[in-house]
Curated annotation (Swiss-Prot):
InterPro entries: Ribosomal_uS14, Ribosomal_uS14_bac/plastid. It comes from Paracidovorax citrulli (strain AAC00-1). This is Small ribosomal subunit protein uS14. Part of the 30S ribosomal subunit. Contacts proteins S3 and S10. It comes from the Bacteria. Keywords: Ribonucleoprotein, Ribosomal protein, RNA-binding, rRNA-binding.
Length: 101
């Protein structure tokens, strides 16, 4: 089980990223647009640097919904591999069966 503080930190990052998503996308588009002048692009880069560090969506980490484990998390289920195994064997995940070939 992950510490509560780490899970709360991730939730805080999600909220910040959602809050600044439009501004971040706008500045990112300007900074990467080759048709814009160098001054505009530089101003956009400076604007990106002034945003909070945690507003960047790449700083978010996928965590297991149950345990909070940051590694071995499957996006499709939102669960860590160990929890997927437990729940699949218990029959709690519909459509998931043990492989046999």
């Amino acid at each position: 089980m992950a510490k509560v503080a780490l899970i709360q930190r991730e939730l805080k990052r999600e909220k910040l990223a959602a809050k600044y998503a439009a501004k971040y996308a706008e500045l990112k588009a300007i900074a990467s647009d080759a048709k814009r002048s160098d001054e505009e692009r530089e101003a956009a880069r400076l604007g990106l640097q002034k945003l909070p560090r945690n507003a960047n969506p790449t700083r978010q980490r996928n965590r297991c919904e149950i345990t909070g484990r940051p590694r071995g998390t499957f996006r499709q289920f939102g669960l860590a591999r160990a929890k997927i195994r437990e729940l699949a064997f218990a029959g709690d995940i519909p459509g998931v069966t043990k492989a046999s070939w």
